[in-house]
Amino acid sequence: MPRIALYPGSFDPVTNGHLDVVRRAVTLCDRLIVAIGVHPGKKPLFSTEERLAMVRDVFGPIAAEAGCAFDCTTYDNLTITAAQQAGATIMVRGLRDGTDLDYEMQIAGMNETMAPTVQTVFVPASVAVRPITATLVRQIAAMGGDVSAFVPPQVAALLKTKFAG
């Protein structure tokens, strides 16, 4: 039976922190599904279609190089429900610090109750990417700052275009 992992997030935008998680996640599974949460109450910087393209462009080659099948999708329900619908038995979550751990442990506990066959796997962020958040990247880019140290090159170009003029 193939090991299918779901890596959920908003990916608005994709950061080097996300990239760090994906590089390690593809070693844990046979198929990685990156799931973009779409929530009607949120107003993302990038459209759903733009985020899907970004995820495919950045993560697809990493999965291919690792010999891991790769898909990306969207969901607008509970993340654990999305994992079940995708046939995932692994939920991948990145951790930057203790605050992330406290929050993620609560969610993992609830998810385990709702779907005991889906195991949460925590991937600690590498030191170099620990301070990166998509929120901070958006703020820096919006104010004309250089985000090239925090995002893949193609994402830096998209952000520059998004905030041009």
From Swiss-Prot:
**Which cofactors are reported in the record for this sequence?**
Mg(2+)
Name of the protein this chain belongs to = Phosphopantetheine adenylyltransferase
Residues reported in the UniProt entry to bind ATP? 10-11, 18, 94-96, 104, 129-135
Its taxonomic path starts at: Bacteria, Pseudomonadati, Pseudomonadota, Alphaproteobacteria, Hyphomicrobiales
HAMAP family assigned: PPAT_bact (MF_00151)
Gene3D superfamilies for this protein: HUPs
Give the species.
Rhodopseudomonas palustris (strain BisA53)
- What is catalyzed by this enzyme? (R)-4'-phosphopantetheine + ATP + H(+) = 3'-dephospho-CoA + diphosphate
Keyword Transferase assigned to the entry: answer is yes
Which GO terms fall under biological process for this protein?
Answer: coenzyme A biosynthetic process
Where in or outside the cell it occurs: the entry states:
Cytoplasm
Classification via PANTHER family: PHOSPHOPANTETHEINE ADENYLYLTRANSFERASE
